[in-house]
Amino acid sequence: MTMISVNEFKNGLTIQYNNDLWRIVEFQHVKPGKGSAFVRSKLKSLRTGAVQEYTFRSTAKVETADIQTKSMQYLYNDGSSYVFMDTSTYDQLAIPNEQIGDEANYLLENMVVSVITHEGETLGIQLPNTVDLKVAKTEPNIKGDTSSGGGKPATMETGLVVNVPFFINEGDVLTINTSDGTYVSRANK
């Protein structure tokens, strides 16, 4: 593990701080008129999923964490955990429901995701930036609705509820952003 200056922060970088592993969600370099510069950051704990804000002096150094990612295929949920299979060795790995959390709303059977580990400890999964999900339920279109410019709720095949444009119908396949759960577009299928 190496030490880096907080001035080298990048979104997605994993650091070890306060006896926990954190992924940098966002950061901002601040140079006030008086006083020394500092870095304001928003960090997500890889163990608990909690997001916290930290402020570092610009001269501070933090330790980077050596995490590994392995491509694995999602198989099924057995009620208490999600089961993934290593596509090269066919070994199976069960990750508890609590550790997957809201990311379960984007998981489809046979989907390939990256499983994140640190020193043999499984920390969770990393989803692709977008996933294609089928609309399971939504209100029917009513002519003239487009003038209001809003949207309507749609329940996806995984149970995720997304606000979508009025022209979306049941059975449509949509591309959904996994970082914030928003509608991106209709999928090209």
Curated annotation (Swiss-Prot):
Keyword Cytoplasm in record: yes
What Pfam families is this protein classified in? Answer: EFP (PF01132), EFP_N (PF08207), Elong-fact-P_C (PF09285)
MF terms (GO), sorted A to Z:
translation elongation factor activity
Biological process (GO), any one: peptide biosynthetic process
GO-annotated cellular components: cytoplasm
Query: InterPro entries given for it?
Result: Elong-fact-P_C, NA-bd_OB-fold, Rib_uL2_dom2, Transl_elong_fac_P/YeiP, Transl_elong_KOW-like, Transl_elong_P/YeiP_cen, Transl_elong_P/YeiP_CS, Transl_elongation_fac_P
Summarizing the function annotation, the protein's role is: Involved in peptide bond synthesis. Stimulates efficient translation and peptide-bond synthesis on native or reconstituted 70S ribosomes in vitro. Probably functions indirectly by altering the affinity of the ribosome for aminoacyl-tRNA, thus increasing their reactivity as acceptors for peptidyl transferase.
Q: Which HAMAP family match?
A: EF_P
Q: What is this protein called?
A: Elongation factor P 2
Q: What is the lineage of its organism?
A: Bacteria, Bacillati, Bacillota, Bacilli, Lactobacillales
What gene name is listed for this protein?
A: efp2
